[in-house]
Amino acid sequence: MTGDNTLIHSHGINRRDFMKLCAALAATMGLSSKAAAEMAESVTNPQRPPVIWIGAQECTGCTESLLRATHPTVENLVLETISLEYHEVLSAAFGHQVEENKHNALEKYKGQYVLVVDGSIPLKDNGIYCMVAGEPIVDHIRKAAEGAAAIIAIGSCSAWGGVAAAGVNPTGAVSLLSLIHISEPTRP
């Protein structure tokens, strides 16, 4: 075990007991003995997971909620918990540069990043009702979903289609779940 062990030691747990605990947890979950070492490593050397946040037909309410959160604050979240690789609204870059940053993050962290999507996804007329960099947002989301380790639909629009999918639904808005055809959502 390397790294900062102060959290573990502050609770009166020494290295040996901690490794025993990890081994017991791995055995309880039916995992290999190697998993115990991996658990210990991930606890003592936490890495900030890369996050790619794509907004579709949205009001930016989910981003506003994130910015106004008090625990954790957006500063703590972005500087200590996650590595926010792409968020069109919060990015310092714009135009071609922000799209290049997103493309680079998709390639660099393929299979490792968490994809967060807010907003419903318009499918009518080939998705022309929500375009980013000259392409329908649906294409951006499908491409990002292919390489994601995990996908999170944030807010009612992304989770259920929201207001845009209600009633007349002129843009053919759908939820993220409908778009990527996951049969059953996984809840923490």
What are the residue ranges of the model-derived segments?
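Extended, subdomain-level signal for the structured scaffold at the beginning of enzyme domains
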Residues: 19, 38-141
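N-terminal secretory signal peptides
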Residues: 1-13
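N-terminal export signals
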Residues: 17-39
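Residue-level detector of conserved catalytic or cofactor/ligand-binding positions
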Residues: 178-188
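Twin-arginine (Tat) signal peptide motif
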Residues: 10-17, 186
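A short alpha->loop->secondary-structure connector
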Residues: 167-179
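Short, conserved loop/helix-junction motifs that constitute active-site signature segments
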Residues: 143-148
